[in-house]
Amino acid sequence: KTLGYEVDVWVREGLVDGLICLSGLTNATVDTGLDLASAKETTAGTDCLVLSGFGQSLARQTDHQATPEMVWAAAANAHAQAADGFGLADACTFPDGWPWTPTQYDAWRRIGSPELLATSDKHYRVQSRGPRVPPVWLPGGDPPLPRALEEGEPLEFRLMVADDLDRWQEAGRVEWVRLKVRITAIEASLNEVEVRLNNQVLGDDLLLLNDYTYRLTSKGPVNPYGFVYEFVLPPDCFPREGDNRVTVILRQRDRKISLPFEVYDVDLEVRYQQHGNYQRNPLGRAG
């Protein structure tokens, strides 16, 4: 409606065979939690299909396009919302060039099967614009990240998760679940940050810090500088199936530093074992 289109009227009159839902107009960055509720409501009681489109632009130093785990996360969320289909909505899809590699064939093979996706590794992330993608002119179309982090002002982010982690934990299939929050320009030892998942404070006993200040890789210096706050989640802190809320609060900041802080990335990674008691490296280093 923002663009002046009467989509609901077209659907009711049977003029539309399907709606392809995207997180942006074109070249959208990775969004593993595209909300299909409005489209499902619009098409309820009609023959119009709801298809979930996935943009693979990641705009990050490590990966320019979505990893297989991100694709699986987005596909699983689409199926969980009863989408009629899920597809890659880019002009072309060659993450590692042409021809496709076995990694790509494995990634694409799973996206149509909720059963295969259920215990596929996932990488969920809050959509982030990143340094290479300009702001979106469409009202409401700009991604949630990055966001300025001010002292005492909580930031809350929605994170949609398709996994039934309680079920798979009980079956011995969950290897680990990790929540990562990347904050730019911050020095962790001089500033107090609190992270919550569904209003549950994640304690320092779960925290692993990753310093991105003056880090060099084979692809050049890591930027922007800052820290990643990574939490290894125990079962009683697992995200729930469906909507989750990640809250980031700067409790106290170093008064001697005037640089603005930003929440740059929010990621949740789920790693599965292929079956109970399965070790990925059964022989260890010696083998």
State where each predicted segment sits:
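Active-site clefts of carbohydrate-active enzymes
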Residues: 39-68
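Short beta-strands within extracellular/lumenal beta-sheet-rich domains
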Residues: 147-170, 227-231
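Substrate-binding cleft of secreted/luminal carbohydrate-active enzymes
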Residues: 18-29, 54, 63-127
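Beta-strand-rich ligand-recognition modules
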Residues: 184-278
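Short edge beta-strand/loop segments characteristic of extracellular beta-sandwich folds
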Residues: 160-162, 178-184
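Extended extracellular/luminal ectodomain segments enriched in beta-structured repeat modules
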Residues: 167-180
